[in-house]
Amino acid sequence: MPDSSLSNKGISKNFKIMLVILFLMEFARGMYVLSYVNYLPTVTSIAVAVTSAALSIHFISDAATNFVIGFLLKKFGTKLVLTLGFLLAFISLFLVIWFPTNPIVIILSAIMLGIAVSPIWVIMLSSVEEAQRGKQMGYVYFAWLLGLLVGWAFMNVLVKLHPTRFAFMMSLVVVIAWVLYYFVDIKLTNYNTKPVSEQLGQIVDVMKRHLVLFPGILLQGASISALLPILPTYATKVVGVSTIEYTIAIAIGGAGCAFSMLFLSKIIDKNSKGFMYAVIFTGFILFTAFIFGLSLVTNILIVWIVAIFIGLMYGILLPAWNTFMAGQIDPAEQEETWGVFNSVQGFGSMIGPLFGGLIAQFSNGLNNTFYFSAAIFLVLAIFYGVYFVKYRGKANRF
C-alpha cells in the first residue's frame, strides 16, 4: 500500500482516503455534538443543563483520550485501536436511534464519541510529510472544518424535518468511515511496549521539552471558544440580526478559512522559517484587531466582512502554527507528542466558554468577553514575537 503521506507528485491514494475518513468522523461529530444535542431542548422535554453537560463531557473525554492515545497506538497497534474507536463511535450513535431523548444515553454517547475520534486525529497529524507540512496541514484542517460544518448544517435540515427520525444517519456515516479504513495501510514511527510508569514519565518529558509551545496551544483555543457562549446573543441583541443572518456570518467565516487552508497554506512550505514566524505574529496581531473590532460593530455587512477576513487569516495561521509546532517534535515520538498537544488544546477549548460566559454574566456586558479574547491574542503576539526575535538572533550567531 502507498505510504500515508504526500508524495512528490501530490497526495497519495492512502492519504486521500485518510482525509475522507477524518471528514466523515468529523461530519458525524458535527451532526451529533453541534446540531442534534443543541437542538433537543427546543423540541423535546430534555433540559438545557443535560445537553450542556453532554457537550462539556464530550470535549473532556476527547482531551483526556488525546493525552494517552499516542502511547496506546504504539503499544497495541493502529488496527486494534482504530477498530475499537470506530466500534465505540458506532455504538454511541446507534444508541441514540433507540433512545433519542434519554439523558443518560445523550451524555454517554457524547463521552464515547469524544474518545472514538481521538486516534484518527493523532494518526493524521503524525503521518504528514515534513517537506510539505504546511500544505498537508491545510488539507487536514480543511477536512476537519468542512466535516464539522457540513455535518452541522446537514443535521440542522434533518431535525427540522423531524427531531429524531433521522438519527440513524449519524451512525451510518461512521459505518462508511469504518469500511474505508480497511482500504488504507497506516504505519507509525515505531512500536513499543513500554510500561505505564515509563509512559507517564515520557508524557512529563514531552511537556517539559515543549513548554514554549503551551501558551499558544492552550490560549488560542481558549480565546476563540470564549466567544462561543456570547456570539448568538451578540448577533441577535446587539447587531439585531436573524438566526439565518448569523448563520451566514459563520458560513462566510468558514468559507474564508477553507479557501485559505486549501490554497494559501501551501506558501508556508515555499518560504523560510522567518516567513512562517511573520505569519504567526501577524496572525495574532490581526486577530487582536478583528476581535476587538467586533465589539464596535453593529452593522451586519461589516460583520460579514470581518468574518471573511478572520476566516482567511485563521486558515493560514493554523497551518503555520502547526508547522512551527511540528518543527519542535522528535520524529520518533510524533504520536505521543501530538496526542499531548491535542489534549492541551482541548483543555483550552473547554475553559474558554467557561471564562467567556462568566465574564459576560458578572460584568453585565458582552463587550468584555471580546476584550478578554482580544487581549489573549495580544499577549500571544508579544510572547511569540519576542521568542522569534531571540531565536533568530541565536541562529544568526551560529
Curated annotation (Swiss-Prot):
Record GO cellular component, one term: plasma membrane
Keywords: Antiport, Cell membrane, Lipid transport, Membrane, Transmembrane, Transmembrane helix, Transport, Virulence
Transmembrane regions listed in the UniProt entry: 15-34, 46-73, 80-99, 105-126, 138-159, 165-184, 211-231, 243-263, 275-294, 300-320, 340-363, 369-389
Places the protein is found: Cell membrane
SUPFAM superfamilies according to UniProt: MFS general substrate transporter
Bilayer disposition of the protein: Multi-pass membrane protein
GO molecular function, one term: antiporter activity
InterPro entries reported for this sequence: MFS, MFS_dom, MFS_trans_sf, MFS_Transporters, Tet-R_TetA/multi-R_MdtG-like
Alphabetized CDD domains for the sequence: MFS_MdtG_SLC18_like
Top-level taxon: Bacteria
Function: Proton-coupled antiporter flippase that catalyzes the translocation, from the inner to the outer leaflet of the cell membrane, of the lipid-linked disaccharide (anchor-LLD) that anchors lipoteichoic acids (LTA) to the cell membrane.
Similarity comment: Belongs to the major facilitator superfamily. LtaA family.
PANTHER family, per the entry: INTEGRAL MEMBRANE TRANSPORT PROTEIN (PTHR23517:SF3), RESISTANCE PROTEIN MDTM, PUTATIVE-RELATED-RELATED (PTHR23517)
Protein name, as recorded: Proton-coupled antiporter flippase LtaA
Protein species of origin: Staphylococcus haemolyticus (strain JCSC1435)
